[in-house]
Amino acid sequence: MRHFTCVQDLGDLKQALNEAFEIKKDRFQFSELGKNKTLLMIFFNSSLRTRLSTQKAAMNLGMNTIVLDVNQGAWKLETERGVIMDGDKPEHLLEAVPVMGCYCDVIGVLSLIHI
């Protein structure tokens, strides 16, 4: 699967849920699947449970993880189109994402805002 943005992207939901239940029986059965792969998690909004569960799932798959808390720490990204880049956001999301994609195999985004 190249892009996953909604439940319909899974195809057969029942089959996906059955596979998830099987994986839960032995969480480490695919621990080599993510070997030498990197997951970048981009958070536009804080979520402790989402961050922990996603990071733990990646670790169970053997993946490395990078967490980027946008606009809540040192990293601020502009999301509006056509904005003059003279404020406190030194990078624009549209320019940063291709670079991130060069370094990471999987990018996950949590955003409760329209970007």
Briefly describe each language-model feature range.
Residues 1-48, 52, 56:
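Positively charged, low-complexity intrinsically disordered leader regions
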Residues 96-110:
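A glycine-rich helix N-cap at a beta->alpha junction
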Residues 37-40, 63-66, 105-108:
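Structural motif
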Residues 47-94, 99:
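Active-site cofactor/substrate anionic-group-binding motifs, chiefly glycine-
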Residues 9-11, 76-79, 104-107:
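Short, mixed-charge, low-aromatic patches
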Residues 113-115:
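Conserved small/polar residues in nucleotide/adenosyl-binding loops
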